Amino acid sequence: MSLAAYCVICCRRIGTSTSPPKSGTHWRDIRNIIKFTGSLILGGSLFLTYEVLALKKAVTLDTQVVEREKMKSYIYVHTVSLDKGENHGIAWQARKELHKAVRKVLATSAKILRNPFADPFSTVDIEDHECAVWLLLRKSKSDDKTTRLEAVREMSETHHWHDYQYRIIAQACDPKTLIGLARSEESDLRFFLLPPPLPSLKEDSSTEEELRQLLASLPQTELDECIQYFTSLALSESSQSLAAQKGGLWCFGGNGLPYAESFGEVPSATVEMFCLEAIVKHSEISTHCDKIEANGGLQLLQRLYRLHKDCPKVQRNIMRVIGNMALNEHLHSSIVRSGWVSIMAEAMKSPHIMESSHAARILANLDRETVQEKYQDGVYVLHPQYRTSQPIKADVLFIHGLMGAAFKTWRQQDSEQAVIEKPMEDEDRYTTCWPKTWLAKDCPALRIISVEYDTSLSDWRARCPMERKSIAFRSNELLRKLRAAGVGDRPVVWISHSMGGLLVKKMLLEASTKPEMSTVINNTRGIIFYSVPHHGSRLAEYSVNIRYLLFPSLEVKELSKDSPALKTLQDDFLEFAKDKNFQVLNFVETLPTYIGSMIKLHVVPVESADLGIGDLIPVDVNHLNICKPKKKDAFLYQRTLQFIREALAKDLEN
């Protein structure tokens, strides 16, 4: 028993002792008083000395803490004293009880005040170091979903913590919380630890060889001809022969090339790019995703992602693979452990719309707390890309045309002035995707989706089966992907350019024959056609390169003037639309488009763009710019916005 405790006991005995007899004080009692008083004074002095030394030890500054704050990947561990002697005594017990009382006060304030973790409290040194941090962590692991979401929201809105407090969250939170933070717009990037170190490459190996081995490890049987072609080409050929054979014919996912201005260009390719394109197609098969994960594909793709920071096309293909793998929920833990959530959280904040949209697709497929839909390859949500409290009341879908892309087709019309004049107001700045930049701001209650599909102008040395490129095949594939994304659950407006309008018509006809797709028909409120060749186009007859003239692709053949397939589609759609309650708006170009350097072609004349129903509006632009407004207050955009609001008026009011 400590001396201080002995003094307290002695004092208690004196206080509870009976009154002395009135006969007087005996010398023995006097000696006892002196003994007890001396003990009390001595014990008190020792107690005060101990407390002073303990206080001095507690307030001693560890100069290494400053260095630890600079290390973003530093692991903060709550240390426990190994000296059991420090865990005894009245002083230790008193401090422990005091700390418990402080925690109770803070916990009570958390219930009374909505924002209890102000800066003065964020640095309170208590037994668990940071009460605010651990209270939020506890809430984030609650069995109640609403409580979990509220905890993530509070974390994302916290910006006054120190580095180590964010690191505590990063190390202690579960995958659901980490994904939720990545999908919260205001989240601090300090919530995300650096990805774990990548395994070293094997001796005398390279990323190219590792990619080959990964591709060779994937199943090679029961594959369609496109996957077989890419796989065999990537495994057997050199970089030089690949560049010669690619010939510009492959455009999986769309590379954003101008519509017809690059007919004669032959882009170069590398073994890595061909391996990636093959792996993208393999990753659309669930069992192949398991093989990719088991063979270290997540780490290898991350290495490649880091090596090609200056090559957006390589990074986009890698993100397509990760996004496809994220469709399989049993792979989510592996994706999180490999560090991809941290990488995508940073990519979400990129000013480049394509990069942020690919990252948004990955995180949406990982987020099963707030997202029920699954976004398959080629389906990108432009708005909302983060978690939001804004109720989504309708969908607007953008379908590009031949040789188009999900983002670049819908960019603002190119302007030299926009490039030269950098200091502009936000409303006047050039946008690479006006649906995301303009429409999302004007109609925040919309979910805006843009789809991407592969197209080509020629079948020159093509190896894929012809039916894969037909309008019927593409429309069926797109309809399946859009339904998986929840299209049809809300009111829908379709916006299409060129061949994309033919796909929209075919998708609606397909949906009308399938009972499980009936909601797509019932919820369609309107369709906008930008220069859609309802009656065909002469594009295939005006190719600059002779091989395109001799071997036009199937989609080009189907776009030919007076095509039987096109006529059947037109007649069937008009019959289908007779008793349907949706609005139609047609825009048509009036200016020719330069095909190459010498030939101008009116790709879709007025008579071909006339659907036969809905308004037909001629616009003084060419085929490329019919879907690219010059600025936000231009007629093209304002009329489009007006149509969307009118078609969805009742739905947006509710």
From Swiss-Prot:
SUPFAM superfamilies: alpha/beta-Hydrolases, ARM repeat. It is a single-pass membrane protein. The keyword Calcium does not apply. One of its GO terms (cellular component) is mitochondria-associated endoplasmic reticulum membrane contact site. GO terms for biological process: extracellular matrix organization; intracellular cholesterol transport; phosphatidylglycerol acyl-chain remodeling; phospholipid biosynthetic process. InterPro entries: AB_hydrolase_fold (IPR029058), ARM-like (IPR011989), ARM-type_fold (IPR016024), SERAC1 (IPR052374). It is found in: Mitochondrion membrane; Endoplasmic reticulum; Mitochondrion. The chain crosses the membrane at residues 32-54. Belongs to the SERAC1 family. It is linked to 3-methylglutaconic aciduria with deafness, encephalopathy, and Leigh-like syndrome: An autosomal recessive disorder characterized by childhood onset of delayed psychomotor development or psychomotor regression, sensorineural deafness, spasticity or dystonia, and increased excretion of 3-methylglutaconic acid. Brain imaging shows cerebral and cerebellar atrophy as well as lesions in the basal ganglia reminiscent of Leigh syndrome. Keywords: Deafness, Disease variant, Endoplasmic reticulum, Lipid biosynthesis, Lipid metabolism, Membrane, Mitochondrion, Phospholipid biosynthesis, Phospholipid metabolism, Transmembrane, Transmembrane helix. The lineage of its organism: Eukaryota, Metazoa, Chordata, Craniata, Vertebrata. It comes from the Eukaryota. Widely expressed, with predominant expression in skeletal muscle and brain. In the brain, highest levels are found in the frontal and occipital cortices, cerebellum and hippocampus. This is Protein SERAC1. Its main location: mitochondrion. Facilitates the transport of serine from the cytosol to the mitochondria by interacting with and stabilizing Sideroflexin-1 (SFXN1), a mitochondrial serine transporter, playing a fundamental role in the one-carbon cycle responsible for the synthesis of nucleotides needed for mitochondrial DNA replication. Plays an important role in the phosphatidylglycerol (PG) remodeling that is essential for both mitochondrial function and intracellular cholesterol trafficking. It comes from Homo sapiens (Human).
